[in-house]
Amino acid sequence: MTITKQTGQVTAVADGTVVTPEGFQAAGVNAGLRYSKNDLGVILCDVPASAAAVYTQSHFQAAPLKVTQASLAVEQKLQAVIVNRPCANACTGAQGLKDAYEMRELCAKQFGLALHHVAVASTGVIGEYLPMEKIRAGIKQLVPGVTMADAEAFQTAILTTDTVMKRACYQTTIDGKTVTVGGAAKGSGMIHPNMATMLAFITTDANVSSPVLHAALRSITDVSFNQITVDGDTSTNDMVVVMASGLAGNDELTPDHPDWENFYEALRKTCEDLAKQIAKDGEGATKLIEVRVRGAKTDEEAKKIAKQIVGSNLVKTAVYGADANWGRIIGAIGYSDAEVNPDNVDVAIGPMVMLKGSEPQPFSEEEAAAYLQQETVVIEVDLHIGDGVGVAWGCDLTYDYVKINASYRT
């Protein structure tokens, strides 16, 4: 199934979380896995929910992803997702897989669920075994609730080098009923996904089947999470999970439903919002960079070039230094394998046109430097070849990125 519709009427819910949709609860506790803050969390649904997930394309998929895939393979439904930090349980062999299955079993037993209704996720250092004694005790401490405090307890439990919690929530109307989509995510470094993203957990009370939900998630992932980059590194643990309780009471959604576009847009906005928050919170970052490309041969080529630009270390450092060195943007376009006419390209940084028809344009260095001091920097490119459009998000590259990653384990 291919889904491409991307328009609809939605409203942002400023204080919305993963527990705002009907039927969801969350919790987070400090199980003493390493840090003094929460390090074990759960999202629980009142009913078995339609579910879908997308995963990292890394050859070294972590054990929790394999367990989640096994759970979803049974009937494509989930009722809980259990998450830990700061151990990724990746590259841990047979013992790591056994531990991930035990996490699933412990969660199912704690909340009275079927084993295959539990997803497992982990984030943190690769190559370390889970401290299972602490996890066994920690899961028993989880008491899910529906308050903002409960949602934030979960959100805290999934963070590693993140400096802020990432949450988003949007509402729309379907069959005259309010339908809500909420989400929580983590990610700051090792961000260059190719399928999903770091970790993201999406909840909704929409009535939608798992196959339709999966098709929508894959389509939306390609224009949201897959279009962000912080450092060009892809994690072993990247995963996006979405659960739909169906408790909003709408008629079952399909792409032919008259209100389908409303649901699709609410889901897309939630994912895009979380993706941009992840990009903005890149390790050591001070600015969000948004690159908009139009006039490409296809949307795919536009997305590819946008991500190429936002992922260029030379572009990222120029933005950090507030240096309007548009030649670095051209450099990134030039080594893309997308179709480019080098004699007719436009480049703008914010409101200032730097290049038009591949000819340099006069601009004020002072105004450009002032613009580049802003928290959000927009770069626009027009290739004048076709109708393809694409957007990508990233962040500047600072001295602090090196400091954070040089001492990550110590």
Curated annotation (Swiss-Prot):
The record marks 123-124 as: Involved in the stabilization of negative charge on the oxyanion by the formation of the oxyanion hole. GO terms for molecular function: glutamate N-acetyltransferase activity; L-glutamate N-acetyltransferase activity. It catalyses: N(2)-acetyl-L-ornithine + L-glutamate = N-acetyl-L-glutamate + L-ornithine; L-glutamate + acetyl-CoA = N-acetyl-L-glutamate + CoA + H(+). SUPFAM superfamilies: DmpA/ArgJ-like. Optimum pH is 8 for OATase activity and 8-8.5 for AGSase activity. This is Arginine biosynthesis bifunctional protein ArgJ. The lineage of its organism: Bacteria, Bacillati, Bacillota, Bacilli, Bacillales. It is an enzyme of class 2 (transferase). The keyword Secreted does not apply. The record marks 196-197 as: Cleavage. Pathway: Amino-acid biosynthesis; L-arginine biosynthesis; L-ornithine and N-acetyl-L-glutamate from L-glutamate and N(2)-acetyl-L-ornithine (cyclic): step 1/1; Amino-acid biosynthesis; L-arginine biosynthesis; N(2)-acetyl-L-ornithine from L-glutamate: step 1/4. Keywords: Acyltransferase, Amino-acid biosynthesis, Arginine biosynthesis, Autocatalytic cleavage, Cytoplasm, Multifunctional enzyme, Transferase. NCBIfam families: ArgJ (TIGR00120), PRK05388.1 (NF003802). CDD domains: OAT (cd02152). It comes from Geobacillus stearothermophilus.
